């Protein structure tokens, strides 16, 4: 508050839209046990599931923060930076990595954004005067700085 106006940009992913972890839908698992969020992770760690959950948590954080600081000059929003040409694929499990490597090698140049392009939405949320002028808080943005509906679970 002392340095207001302030911005909080929570970087998420389109994986935040995956319903696994919220509803016990058979193809997506058994859902999150909110009394012990680590219960299923201890028995069977699934990186994709945990990544999606963490990205949904980023959206929930920005939304909750925006509500808590409503009326103050603090602007909290979240965004998906887009498919960016980074080294994220190095963390993909071995059984999927061959397919992923093949995809990225063949389509990287035209399907993925450069890191500079991928940073544009975050830079917009962190620096654009429009955020304050239009009182934009608790919103979800997609590349390139397009406001869209957040995941329905957020």
Regions picked out by a protein language model, each given a short descriptive name:
Residues 54, 102-151:
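C-terminal helical subdomain
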Residues 20, 149-154:
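Short, intrinsically disordered, charge-balanced linker/junction segments flanking boundaries
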Residues 1-97:
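Rossmann-fold NAD(P)H-dependent dehydrogenase/reductase core
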Residues 89, 96-104, 154:
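Short, Lys/Arg-enriched charge-dense amphipathic segments
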């Amino acid at each position: 508050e002392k340095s207001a106006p302030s911005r909080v940009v929570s970087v998420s992913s389109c994986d935040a839209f995956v319903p696994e972890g919220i509803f016990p839908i058979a193809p997506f698992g058994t859902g999150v046990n909110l009394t012990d969020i680590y219960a299923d992770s201890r028995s069977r760690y699934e990186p994709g599931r945990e990544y999606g959950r963490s990205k949904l948590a980023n959206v929930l954080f920005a939304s909750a923060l925006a509500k808590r600081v409503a009326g103050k000059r603090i602007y909290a929003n979240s965004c998906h930076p887009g498919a960016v040409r980074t080294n994220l694929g190095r963390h993909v499990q071995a059984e999927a990595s061959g397919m992923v490597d093949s995809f990225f090698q063949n389509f990287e140049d035209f399907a993925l954004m450069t890191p500079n392009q991928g940073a544009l939405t975050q830079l917009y949320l962190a620096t654009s005067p429009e955020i304050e002028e239009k009182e934009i808080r608790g919103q979800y943005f997609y590349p390139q700085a397009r406001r869209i509906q957040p995941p329905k679970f957020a």
